[in-house]
């Protein structure tokens, strides 16, 4: 299996972490590390990670660098064949990652893969990019 790391950018998302991170941790295959890059949170995000999710790696950024800036700084500190970037308000089911890694391994010309995002409030509907709260199908 290739080295893959799930990196979740967080800013003041303690409640999102409590609600959604358990599914990400539970669905991560053996050998895939889950990491949270904290974008200078001022809430209890770091405390929640330390006490409730001790197996999750934490990258502490000293300020809120925004979405792109936060991920750019975080990914400079992570080594992997594949980086799986998730928002902090995403729930993942068992088996969501295998098809993604399979495509990346089989198709060397593919650089980016995204699963379908299903609405958190109505799982019969597709969620658009940029919306908040989802479920990976």
What are these regions (language model features)?
Residues 3-5, 33:
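Cell-envelope/extracellular polymer assembly enzymes that use nucleotide-activated donors
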Residues 8-19, 40:
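Active-site beta-to-alpha loop of glycosyltransferases that engages the nucleotide-sugar donor
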Residues 23, 38-47, 63:
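A conserved acidic beta->alpha catalytic loop
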Residues 23-31:
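Short, acidic, metal-binding catalytic loop of nucleotide-sugar glycosyltransferases
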Residues 31-40, 59-61:
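Short beta-strand/loop segment that forms part of the nucleotide-sugar
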Residues 60-78, 88:
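Glycine-rich, basic loop-to-helix element that forms the pyrophosphate-binding segment
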Residues 69, 76, 91, 98-137:
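Acidic/His-rich active-site region of diverse nucleotide-sugar glycosyltransferases
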Residues 83:
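Short aromatic/hydrophobic "clamp" motif used to bind/position activated sugar donors
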